[in-house]
Structure formats: C-alpha cells, structure tokens
Amino acid sequence: MKHFVVIANAYKDRDFALTNKIVAYIEQKGGTAKGLMSNVEAISDNEFELEDIPQDTQCILVLGGDGTLIRAATRVETLEIPLMGVNLGTLGYLCEVEEATVFDAIDSLMADKYMTEDRIMLIGHKRGSETSRVALNDIVIHRKGNLQILSLNVYVNGEFLNNYHADGIIVATPTGSTGYSMSAGGPIVDPKGDMILLTPNNAHNLTSKSIVLSGDDEIEIEILSRREQNDELACVSYDGDTTAELAVGDRFVISRAANHTKICKLHQRSFLEILRKKMGNYS
C-alpha cells in the first residue's frame, strides 16, 4: 500500500509534530499521506469529515490510543478502510505500534507485509426512530441524574430474557470485552469472535451474570418505571459518548452492524500473548 491518511489525537500529538514526520516519511518513500485531526470529544467542530479522506486511501494510521482509534473507526466505518493504531497513551489493546516503532511499521505496510483482522461493530436505535449509530466497543444504557437504579426488561430476538434492577446494561463486542464490560465483571473474549456480550452494571441481585450471545442476535432493552411519577430517565452511550435519552416505555434495539472494522496487524501475536502483556503492566 502507498496511500495513507494519518489521524492524530489533537491532545497527544500537539502541533502535529509526529504527524508531519510520518507524512514526510511516507512521501519520501514514494507514497501519499494526508494528516487529519481527531479531538477527545467524539462530536466537535474541528473533527475530520469523511469528505476529507481521499478515495484512494488504503490505510488510516491513527495516532493516540484506543479511544482515538475507536472514534476514528466508527466515523469511517462505511469506508471499510483498514486502520492501524499508534499508541501514544498508556494501556492500548487495539494499538499494536508504539511511537518508537512507527516508521518500521510504515515500511512493513508499504511492503505489503501485514494482515487484517475483522472486528464486529454494534448498531443501536430507539424503537420507532430512524436515527441509528454504530459502536466498536459497546453500547451502554445507564441511569441519568439521581442516584437511583433502573428497571430494565431485556429481550433477545423478541423473547423475554430477564428483568434487571441495575445502574445499567452494557452490550459489548468482543473488542469491547476488555473495556467497560470487563470492569463490570464481564468475560474477556477473543476480539475476532462473532458474539455479543450482555453485562448488567451493578445489578441489585446476587445472581445476575453476564451472558454471551450470538453475533446474529438482536437485543431489545425496555425502560420500566419504579416510581409513581414515571419520571425515570436513562441515557444511551456509544463507546462512552452519551448521545440520547430514554424515558419510561422506550425500547432500544441493538444488533451487529453491517460493516466491520478492519485492523492492520504486523505480527501474528496471539490474543493471549497480548492480554498477558497488557494486563501484566497493571497487575
């Protein structure tokens, strides 16, 4: 591959210092590259647009950390261009390359010495609404405002699964299994898997456990009332970005998205090897 876009976290590559070095390096080797900015906020006036990405782009290099890569992946998901993360942060499961090895990585990419992994994404929408959004890690239904738990009915493919009294419900992809889902007690699974993880967050029940569902399943979450006023409100967060509110009686539908995120890999390291290395740093 010869045609690249470099998306940089504006707070981790200030003044585009590393981005400019990468663009110059690629051009020196006969390729093309364009630098774009990504902000910490998922919605920002300064965030890049799809129109900014040239049609001949073969790879997107994302400078920052897992969060930056996730934001970029969901923003460009319709293009299905492979991404490679360059870790400028701390703990990065998605970012295989570090700043010290980025130019060696570019050499490998330009010599076509790489593989790609397909990662499933989720798509969610409120029942009755035509507005939907995708997530690479997770979609979370969680309480808003007062410190009170939610009452949630969960259905899978139209069949009632369970009622949860909890702070919320985390619906995660295999990629997201090492994120918020793990913190709430969910299982860690191979990120290449085709499954959906359902994990109650702080459930008011001694027996509530995570459930691993098929990637083909459709999950529907209904907001119930626990108060006479029927004034409970819940929020929907996609990969940590809160974008919508749900009221009593609303139903929210989550399923596997049509498109995948393609991650460039340079080494055939097993998921367990990566897990040992990353988790070992924080044990």
Swiss-Prot record:
Active site: 66
Known catalytic reactions: NAD(+) + ATP = ADP + NADP(+) + H(+)
Record key words, sorted: ATP-binding, Cytoplasm, Kinase, NAD, NADP, Nucleotide-binding, Transferase
Family: Belongs to the NAD kinase family.
Database matches in InterPro entries: ATP-NAD_kinase_N (IPR017438), ATP-NAD_kinase_PpnK-typ_C (IPR017437), NAD/diacylglycerol_kinase_sf (IPR016064), NADK (IPR002504)
Residue numbers binding NAD(+): 66-67, 71, 137-138, 165, 167, 178-183
One GO CC term on file: cytoplasm
Enzyme Commission number, as recorded: 2.7.1.23
PANTHER family registered for this protein in UniProt: NAD KINASE (PTHR20275:SF0)
Pfam families cross-referenced by the UniProt entry: NAD_kinase, NAD_kinase_C
HAMAP family, A to Z: NAD_kinase
Ranges in coiled-coil conformation: none
Cell compartments where the protein resides: Cytoplasm
Protein source organism: Agathobacter rectalis (strain ATCC 33656 / DSM 3377 / JCM 17463 / KCTC 5835 / VPI 0990) (Eubacterium rectale)
GO BP term, example: NADP biosynthetic process
Protein name (Swiss-Prot/TrEMBL): NAD kinase
MF annotations from Gene Ontology: ATP binding; metal ion binding; NAD binding; NAD+ kinase activity
Main location: cytoplasm
Cofactor(s) this protein requires: a divalent metal cation
Gene3D superfamilies linked: Probable inorganic polyphosphate/atp-NAD kinase, domain 1 (3.40.50.10330), Probable inorganic polyphosphate/atp-NAD kinase, domain 2 (2.60.200.30)
Biological role: Involved in the regulation of the intracellular balance of NAD and NADP, and is a key enzyme in the biosynthesis of NADP. Catalyzes specifically the phosphorylation on 2'-hydroxyl of the adenosine moiety of NAD to yield NADP.
